[in-house]
Regions:
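Topogenic membrane-insertion module of multi-pass membrane proteins
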Residues: 1-44, 48, 145-146, 158
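Intramembrane alpha-helical segments
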Residues: 5, 81-180
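Small-residue-rich segments of transmembrane alpha-helices in multi-pass membrane proteins
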Residues: 24-30, 156-171, 217-222, 283-296
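Membrane-embedded alpha-helical segments that form the functional core of polytopic membrane enzymes
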Residues: 30, 39-63, 126-139, 179-199
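Acidic (Asp/Glu-rich) catalytic motifs at the cytosolic membrane interface
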Residues: 55-79, 194-217
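Multi-pass membrane catalytic core of lipid/isoprenoid biosynthesis enzymes
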Residues: 78-117, 216-248, 287, 292
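Functional transmembrane core segments of multi-pass inner-membrane proteins
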Residues: 158-205, 223-226
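Extended hydrophobic alpha-helices typical of membrane-associated regions
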Residues: 245-302
Length: 302
């Protein structure tokens, strides 16, 4: 399953992990669809929020590559794809400089987003604080002296940042208002995003356990982690039903087309006999989540 990395360019592309970006954009698109539903959509907010999220996700990916190498999770025994630093083509100092670069880009893009979106200094300060928290979370998931990912807290972070803050924050920056129904969709996205992380951790359960990374699958075991994965998939789609029946926006049920793809992902994870068979499910769940959001948005705006 491990693809050999032969050049430095390949190593950097591998470190960026482009396949994670669709999931990162899903919450931004969801918040923007909801803003359009409320007739308050702004293109500049969508573009800047998407750019900021991409920078943050790349920062997180680089930090993950760096941190797991330092802490020993990316050893030769790891069954997932080869990481960039692990390949030997990128040094730890080089990776650290790249982390600084994308940290600065995330901050700059986020500040520009806030300058465009809000005029009230209290709101500006609030969202600046949330943005700095997002940068901190991206870096310290596996990096630093006490990475929270090694304590099994990654699921909470993903649920909050990819779900609640991603959707609600984007909606607010478009509309400068709060709509209770957006919380329901934020919960759905939080569930789906957490499922992606859970599949990642199921894949890496053996190497994580040896490295002392106490992810949820390591703590509860593979079988219960698979059950947990089903709960996340089902819960996310349950909240869609709650949104649809409450708002009477019946066309949003179009998103259930993606639900059937998620079911296939769940079955794939359950049937996988090893990490090599689990790995493709990761990308499929991320893409299914983005498709879910797009279908939801189409149904919402019809």
């Amino acid at each position: 399953m491990k693809k050999e990395i032969k050049t430095k360019k390949e190593a950097w592309l591998h470190a960026v992990r482009l396949r994670t970006l669709p999931l990162a954009l899903a919450s931004i698109f969801a918040g923007s669809f909801l803003a359009a539903w409320q007739e308050s959509f702004r293109w500049e907010i969508l573009v800047l929020a998407s750019l900021t999220t991409i920078f943050l996700q790349i920062l997180s990916n680089l930090s993950n590559d760096y941190g797991d190498t330092v802490h020993g999770a990316d050893s030769a025994e790891r069954q997932g794809p080869v990481r960039a630093v692990q390949s030997g083509l990128i040094s730890l100092p080089e990776m650290k400089r790249a982390m600084y670069l994308f940290g600065v880009l995330s901050l700059f893009s986020g500040l520009l987003l806030l300058f465009v979106a809000v005029q009230d200094w209290k709101l500006f300060a609030l969202f600046l604080g949330l943005g700095l928290a997002a940068i901190w979370a991206a870096i310290t998931y596996t990096s630093g002296s006490n990475p929270y990912g090694y304590a099994g807290l990654g699921d909470i972070s993903v649920f909050v940042f990819f779900g609640l803050l991603g959707v609600l924050g984007t909606f607010f920056l478009h509309t400068l208002s709060f709509e209770p129904m957006t919380v329901i969709i934020a919960i759905s996205l939080g569930c789906f995003s957490t499922a992606v992380l859970n599949i990642n951790n199921i894949r890496d359960i053996e190497s994580d356990e040896k490295a002392g990374k106490r992810s949820i699958p390591v703590r509860i075991g593979r079988q219960k982690a698979i059950q947990y994965n089903w709960v996340l998939i089902m819960s996310g789609n349950f909240w869609l039903i709650a949104f649809t029946t409450t708002t009477r926006e019946w066309y949003t049920l179009l998103a259930f087309l993606a639900y059937f793809l998620m079911l296939k992902v769940g079955v794939g994870v359950q049937k996988a006999k090893n990490s090599a068979e689990t790995d493709p499910c990761l990308k499929k769940m991320a893409m299914s989540t983005l498709l879910w959001v797009i279908l939801f948005g189409i149904g919402l705006l019809v």
